[in-house]
Curated annotation (Swiss-Prot):
The gene is ERVK-9. Keywords: Cell membrane, ERV, Hydrolase, Lipoprotein, Membrane, Metal-binding, Multifunctional enzyme, Myristate, Nucleotidyltransferase, Protease, Repeat, RNA-binding, RNA-directed DNA polymerase, Transferase, Transposable element, Zinc, Zinc-finger. Belongs to the beta type-B retroviral polymerase family. HERV class-II K(HML-2) pol subfamily. The products of the Gag polyproteins of infectious retroviruses perform highly complex orchestrated tasks during the assembly, budding, maturation, and infection stages of the viral replication cycle. During viral assembly, the proteins form membrane associations and self-associations that ultimately result in budding of an immature virion from the infected cell. Gag precursors also function during viral assembly to selectively bind and package two plus strands of genomic RNA. Endogenous Gag proteins may have kept, lost or modified their original function during evolution. It is found in: Cell membrane. It comes from the Eukaryota. The LPQG motifs are catalytically important and conserved among many retroviruses. Residues 58-195 form the Reverse transcriptase domain. GO terms for biological process: proteolysis; viral translational frameshifting. This is Endogenous retrovirus group K member 9 Pol protein.
Length: 1117
């Protein structure tokens, strides 16, 4: 619990700080504990607030609305939460925008102010500092001439008066100046948390918006040298600077864990605790001018705009944040948004902030989008009615009038806000090096990706690619459904187009997809698949009540009270032992009401409960019990269906009712094991425990239960032959998560009479799911290879073998294969192909033909002198031939080479009995030249000579071996023995020592490495032989490329004998049960400073023969 409060406090640090200051100015004290409790409740019932919420009056009212809805659903909302919410709402109302301002005539008629009666007896000073304890509803106050302005000013600005040591000097109302450019008259100062003395209404005053204003002494005026500042600058407003608005940045929980709050707020809070009040000041501040400067006699003192640069701490934090997380990471966006809205940034500040934190390429992007945004904003300013006098020079901080800091410090608030919006938008468009902004159409949710992560990616891409806010919102809402995975789409579909107008669509989607794809959701699906109980109501709150116990959260069929009663009744019934054998089956000591047998002790089928009505089977699912009784004569399987249906006709009669006269007999098919299916899986075969053969003269038809089809479970229809003697199985697929327990009835087997058509004597071959007379389940197919596709056809009872020719219009029979007694005639048309046939005949009759799969067709073939028969498109079309081209895994050339080397399809080349084990032999082709041919095979390469190393010192370097866990020590011993057998290392007594360790690869194998940092420090470096890659522009186009992978190249290059002892290492024994073993490398060790240079030297020597025969070549290694 303490950790949760600490997290809430750190996450909402800026909100808590602002609320405390705001309420303190209104005379209301709220403990931090109550505020933390308030934000805990808000996070619980308003999941959208951490991502999208701000301290805006509209959002705060929405929070109250959703808390009320949660209270109506039975959730307990503490009374202190309601009180704190109402107080903060009353304090936030003065910050509403001008469009939402409330006129006095619209305000409530009176405000209820309950003040303590004891305040009337205290002194005037105490009276001025006391405030109301309860505030019912915020009231819009209007000033009259009876208002005590001094007391009113003390209520709003107590700290200011304490610092000055005197009361405020209020300026009287001015009717000559327009409202937009004049300070707010003192009589129109709004009050939300009012003092003891109530303010009376004056209905003659115009409506006033809720705003706080600083004391009258701090009125803004330009420097005295010019009445309107610099040339071209409009008159600066002389009103009071508004009170700082509440934080509008959204909290983002994806910020780094160690820095939940903003860096800026951490600095500000730390400075406040140390008594440094300058931490709150803006870069451009308003300071009172000395007496006599700028203010004329009889006028209130004026202030002068002065610029103060950023602190090094802020710039450093921005630079580190961009470097570590990226310019557009959630953490950096939050930090930048806090700085932008917490300071009065001029164009010079934005340029310094970007230059100090971004890379040159990123700064170029920022500057480009800044200029682009300025051009768009200037067009809007000119098109406004009336036009706004803010030009491009002012927004960019350039030109004769706005190039200096002192000139930019005098910019209007409207210009500052436009610069802020343009620069924030330009910052969002910055792309990281090497990354491109994807299209929002390509942002799709992964199968295991949480829905909020997908929406966050979609919003980020849409924000970068779509400038219009309304269009961006529509696109995000559309793609949030279209590009979601099927599970989330199923959850969102009921909400699509039905979200209330006042609710946020994305927030409702996020709440609907809460938990999908997580561990809880997977556990729910598995539990649902195993138990068959729908668990949706246990995950989300169930709106209805149980009809059995009246509690909320479950249905009557899942009621724990009812289940407990059933268990009690069952235990009471089964507690007594039956006195004798079961009167129903006569083969077990159990009660007749609990008998589940289908056959009696003689093997005869049982039916009915011998109690009432027509004979009925006991309450048992499936055609047979889960563990059926096997009568004598049936070893290890259930009775054949032929005997089962024979017994059905011999059932006893009850109540003198004749058995139903039906032509079709049926049996229920059930599962004999637990079955679980998930969407997307291929059809599965489910055993039923029922075996053939069927009764003679019948055929079986398997049909699924309609109740399962309505749920999305499909039992595929299949046919069972009468002579099939195997187990009957069901083919099932499902579009929803589904499960079945052993014994559940899921299908029916219908016995239909088999009627032979005509006098056909074709033998029927038994098989499940087909009555195909030929017993074939696949058609003829041929794979394109070196061999020609040849198939056989029967024409008029005579078999012909021919080539499948999809380019031939007609079929052709070779003249030497045409029977002489078959009539033929001279063809009217000729045959044109690769060549032209001289003698062409055609059959005088239309012949009957059977294809390779007994497809019946007719043909009138052409006859000519060709070496083999051709089956043209006239026959192929009647046979239903198709040409398919699946994407091969390997090209035909690669498959041919791999087949010669022992490739086994489906397994590949390797060591584990799936291909050739011996290495490739170097075969020399005497007819060609090039890499791998005679000049390389016949060339004699001298054995490599070791290259000695140059040492800075001969003083031994010894670094102790650090401890390793047991698993790594065991792997280290095995690798050392392997290297010792290969001759790469040898025993050592050297005074040098370096630590050794092992790492595990992705394949699971271990790799031994030596930490040679201390040894490398005393080695004289050689420098690389090939420091860089050649320029691609100088390489001729389409040059041949060969890649040679030298496995363990370092281990084939020897070390100089005098250098081996310097690469010694120690392998400790497990648990120090024996002395450690020491070795030293005889070959180039990995990690040595000069190993790459020596390796390049040896590879260059090995490729020397290539250089002789191929002078123009590039070698990269």
């Amino acid at each position: 619990m303490g950790q949760t409060k600490s997290k809430i406090k750190s996450k909402y640090a800026s909100y808590l700080s602002f609320i405390k200051i705001l309420l303190k100015r209104g005379g209301v004290k709220v403990s931090t504990k109550n505020l933390i409790k308030l934000f805990q409740i808000i996070e619980q019932f308003c999941p959208w607030f951490p991502e999208q919420g701000t301290l805006d009056l509209k959002d705060w009212k929405r929070i109250g609305k959703e808390l009320k809805q949660a209270g109506r659903k039975g959730n307990i909302i503490p009374l202190t939460v309601w009180n704190d919410w109402a107080i903060i709402k009353a304090a936030l109302e003065p910050f509403q925008t001008e469009e939402d301002s409330i006129s006095v005539s619209d305000a409530p008629g009176s405000g209820i102010i309950d003040c303590n009666e004891k305040t009337r007896k205290k002194s005037q000073k105490e009276t001025e500092s006391l405030h109301c304890e309860y505030v019912a509803e915020p009231v819009m106050a209007q000033s009259t001439q009876n208002v005590d302005y001094n007391q009113l000013q003390e209520v709003i600005y107590p700290e200011t008066l304490k610092l000055e040591g005197k009361g405020p000097e209020l300026v009287g109302p001015s009717e000559s100046k327009p409202r937009g450019t004049s300070p707010l008259p003192a009589g129109q100062v709004p009050v939300t948390l009012q003092p003891q003395k109530q303010v009376k209404e004056n209905k003659t005053q115009p409506p006033v918006a809720y705003q706080y204003w600083p004391p009258a002494e701090l009125q803004y005026r330009p420097p005295p040298e010019s009445q309107y500042g610099y040339p071209g600058m409009p008159p600066a407003p002389q009103g009071r600077a508004p009170y700082p608005q509440p934080p509008t940045r959204r909290l983002n929980p994806t910020a780094p864990p160690s820095r939940q709050g903003s860096e800026l707020h951490e600095i500000i809070d730390k400075s406040r605790k140390e008594g440094d009040t300058e931490a709150w000041q803006f870069p451009v501040t308003l300071e009172p001018m000395p007496p006599g400067e700028g203010a004329q006699e009889g006028e209130p003192p004026t202030v002068e705009a002065r610029y103060k640069s950023f602190s090094i701490k802020i710039l450093k934090d921005m630079k580190e944040g961009v470097k570590q997380y990226g310019p557009n990471s959630p953490y950096m966006r939050t930090l930048l948004d806090s700085i932008a809205h917490g300071h009065r940034l001029i164009p010079y500040d934005w340029e310094i902030l970007a230059k100090s934190s971004l890379s040159p390429s990123q700064f170029l992007q920022f500057k480009t989008w800044w200029i682009d945004g300025v051009q768009e904003q200037v067009r809007r300013n000119r098109a406004a009615n009336p036009p706004v006098n803010i030009d491009a020079d002012q927004l960019l901080g350039i030109g004769q009038n706005w190039s200096t800091i002192s000139q930019q410090a005098l910019m209007q608030n409207e210009a500052i806000e436009q610069v802020r919006a343009i620069c924030l938008r330009a910052w969002e468009k910055i792309q990281d090096p090497g990354s491109t902004c994807p299209s929002f159409n390509t942002v799709r949710q992964g199968s295991k990706e949480p829905y909020p992560d997908f929406v966050a990616r979609l919003q980020d891409v849409a924000q970068k690619s779509i400038a219009d806010e309304k269009a961006r919102k529509v696109i995000v809402e559309l793609m949030a459904y279209e590009n979601a995975n099927p599970e989330c789409q199923s959850a969102i579909k009921p909400l699509k187009g039905k979200v209330p107008a006042g609710s946020d669509v994305i927030s409702e989607y996020v709440k609907a997809c809460d938990g999908i794809g997580g561990a809880m959701h997977k556990a729910m699906l598995m539990a649902q698949a195993i138990t068959g109980v729908v668990l949706g109501g246990q995950v989300r709150t169930f709106g209805g009540k149980c009809y059995n116990c009246g509690q909320i959260g479950h249905l009557k069929k899942n009621c724990p009270v009812l289940n407990k009663q059933n268990i009690t009744i069952q235990a009471t019934t089964t507690g007594r032992e039956p006195p004798d054998l079961c009167p129903r089956c006569k083969k077990g000591k159990h009660w007749a009401s609990q008998c589940r047998s289908k056959f009696d002790k003689n093997g005869q089928p049982l039916s009915g409960n011998e109690q009432r009505g027509q004979p009925q089977a006991p309450q048992q699912t499936g055609a047979f019990p889960i563990q059926p009784f096997v009568p004598q004569g049936f070893q290890g399987q259930q009775p054949p269906l032929s005997q089962v249906f024979q017994g059905i006709s011999q059932l006893p009669q009850y109540n003198n009712c004749p058995p139903p006269q039906v032509a079709v007999q049926q049996v229920d098919l059930c599962t004999i094991q637990a079955v679980s299916l998930l969407p997307g899986e291929p059809p599965q075969k489910i055993p039923t425990g029922v075996y053939g053969p069927l009764p003679e003269g019948t055929v079986g038809l398997i049909l699924g239960r309609s109740s399962l089809n309505l749920k999305g479970v499909q039992i595929h229809t299949s046919v069972v032959d009468s002579d099939y003697k195997g187990e009957i199985q069901l083919v099932i697929s499902s579009s929803v998560p589904w499960s079945a327990s052993p014994g559940d009835r899921i299908a029916q087997l219908l016995l239909l009479p088999y009627i032979k058509g005509g006098n056909s004597e074709i033998k029927r071959i038994g098989g499940l799911g087909s009555t195909d007379p030929t017993g074939k389940a696949a058609y003829w197919a041929s794979q394109v290879s070196e061999n020609r596709p040849v198939c056989k056809a029967i024409i008029q009872g005579k078999q012909f073998e021919g080539l499948v020719d999809t380019g031939a219009d007609v079929s052709i029979i070779a003249l030497n294969q045409w029977p002489k007694n078959w009539p033929k005639q001279k063809a009217v048309t000729g045959l044109v192909g690769i060549g032209t046939a001289s003698e062409v005949y055609q059959s005088m009759e239309i012949l009957h033909c059977l294809g390779p799969d007994n497809q019946e067709s007719t043909v009138q073939p052409m006859i000519t002198s060709i070496p083999l028969n051709l089956w043209g498109r006239d026959l192929l079309q009647q046979w239903g031939a198709e040409i398919t081209m699946p994407a091969p895994l390997y090209s035909p050339t690669s498959q041919k080479i791999m087949t010669k080397r022992g490739y086994i399809p489906g397994k590949g080349l390797g060591k584990n009995e799936d291909g050739i084990k011996i290495p490739f032999e170097a075969k020399i082709n005497q007819k060609r030249e090039g890499i791998g041919y005679p000049f390389l095979g016949a060339a004699t390469i001298e054995p490599p000579k070791p290259i000695p190393l140059t040492w800075k010192t001969e003083k031994p370097v010894w670094v102790n071996q650090w401890p390793l866990p047991k698993q790594k020590l065991e792997a280290l011993h095995l690798l050392a023995n392997e290297q010792l057998e290969k001759g790469h290392i040898e025993p050592s007594f050297s005074p040098w020592n370096s630590p050794v360790f092992v790492i595990q690869k992705k394949s699971g194998k271990w790799r031994m490495l030596t930490d040679l940092r201390a040894v490398n420090a005393v080695i004289q470096p050689m420098g690389p032989l090939q420091p860089g890659l050649p320029s691609p522009a100088m390489i001729p186009k389409d040059w041949p490329l060969i890649i040679i992978d030298l496995k363990d190249c370092f281990f084939t290059i020897p070390l100089a004998e005098q250098d081996c002892e310097k690469f010694a290492f120690t392998i400790p024994a497990i648990n120090n049960k024996e002395p450690a073993t020491r070795f030293q490398w005889k070959v180039l060790p990995q990690g040595m400073l000069n190993s790459p240079t020596i390796c390049q030297t040896f590879v260059g020597r090995a490729l020397q023969p290539v250089k002789v025969f191929r002078l123009l070549y590039y070698s990269l290694y």
